[in-house]
Curated annotation (Swiss-Prot):
Disulfide bonds: none
Places the protein is found: Fimbrium
Misc remark: The operon is cryptic under classical laboratory conditions, but is functional when constitutively expressed.
Organism listed in the record: Escherichia coli (strain K12)
Family to which the UniProt record says this protein belongs: Belongs to the fimbrial protein family.
One of the Pfam families matching this protein, by short name: Fimbrial
Top-level taxonomic group: Bacteria
Record protein name field: Uncharacterized fimbrial-like protein ElfG
Gene: elfG
Length: 356
């Protein structure tokens, strides 16, 4: 009985030591090196203000290198998943990406007219175009980088605080393009022990870059000289709104003659598109939603083809530096087939002009 008990004890001890060794191995391999911001300002505003493109630059494919450069001095604290007992043997590495649509060759789509190529400066390396991964910067001991509270980084020399972006024209535009604040790029940081250049765009970014600004074009076109057009559709009997998508009996069609003028400096005809934008009626999306449920407003071209309020276009070819006319028709329709309550109704729409 005692010998058997002894063998059981030996077996249990062996199993116990094996479990301890396996746990110790798992702990030594658990550090990812990935870093995150613990406090401070992790956002860099890339606001280039208001800039104007010369006429020859407002052409598809034109690139404006280093359209805007920045050199900020954000202060923030970074903590990394690393072994604080071996912090002196570590190395910094970086990665970056963008949430914008990737067009290839490091270009990201800002909107239908513009694209950006972003270069970020990390310490010890040349400016690198986004996206990138596994960019090492050599040894740079930070004693508290593995602590939960993190290590303070800051000043204009800190990695990621400086950079630039180039601008590419995807298609020419008229007037102004306003870029509201949008996430342009994200920088990820790693501290690898033992020293290595491994770093990917996973986890939480250390810095996020927000782009904003306004770009003006010297070439310009205008619709009704930029003034508001008011359309009076008169009085209609509510009982006549009975067929979805149809103009009620007795309703009038307003025929609009809208002045259009372009001054682009180009000889010959200018090809333009008038685009219509408004809130669509959920019951009949081809109509503009009005303040009166069951009543919508339809806009057509001169051939009675409906122009969708969700970005429908009216193409025109007009002479440069001369007055021209765009013709549209406007009339009310039923959107539900149910006669609406009596009363006034209103609707608004925006007409934007683009040229090739």
């Amino acid at each position: 009985m005692q010998i058997i008990f002894g063998e059981k004890c030996v077996s249990l001890l062996r199993l116990f030591f094996a479990a301890v060794l396996m746990l110790w191995c798992a702990q030594t391999a658990a550090y990812s090196g990935q870093c995150h911001t613990t406090q401070g300002n992790p956002y860099i505003g890339v606001n280039f203000g208001v800039k104007t493109l010369e006429e020859e630059a407002n052409t598809a494919g034109v690139v404006k290198d280093k359209f805007y450069q920045w050199n900020e001095s954000n202060d923030y604290y970074v903590s990394c998943d690393c072994d604080k007992d071996n912090v002196r043997s570590g190395r910094w590495a970086f990665a970056a990406d963008s949430p914008l649509v990737y067009l290839g060759d490091n270009w990201y789509k800002i909107n239908d007219y513009l694209a950006a190529k972003v270069l970020l400066q990390v310490k010890g390396s040349s400016p690198t175009a986004v996206p990138f991964e596994n960019v090492g910067t050599g040894g740079d001991t930070r004693w508290h980088i593995c602590d939960p509270g993190g290590q303070r980084l800051g000043g204009q020399g800190a990695s990621g605080n400086s950079g630039s972006f180039s601008l590419k024209i995807l298609q020419p535009f008229v007037g102004s393009v306003v870029i509201p604040p949008m996430a342009l790029a994200r920088l990820y940081e790693c501290y690898n022990i033992p020293a290595g250049d491994s770093c990917t765009t996973t986890g939480t970014p250390v810095l996020v870059y927000y782009l904003s600004g306004t770009i003006n074009s010297l070439g310009s076109c205008s619709v009704n000289a930029g003034e508001t057009i008011e359309v009076d559709l008169g009085d209609v009997f509510a009982a006549n709104f009975r067929v979805v998508g149809h103009k009620p009996l007795g309703a009038r069609t307003a025929e609009l003659a809208i002045p259009v003028r372009c001054n682009t400096g180009n000889a010959g005809l200018v090809n333009v598109n008038l685009s219509l934008t408004a809130t669509t009626d959920p019951s009949y999306p081809q109509a503009i939603k009005t303040s009166r449920p069951g009543v919508g407003v339809v806009v057509t071209d001169s051939q009675n083809n409906i122009i969708s309020p969700a970005g429908g276009t009216l193409p025109l070819s007009i002479p440069d530096d001369a007055d021209s006319i765009a013709r549209m028709n406007v009339y009310p329709v039923s959107t539900t087939g149910v006669p609406p309550e009596t009363g006034r109704f209103e609707a608004t729409a925006t007409v934007r002009i683009n040229f090739d």
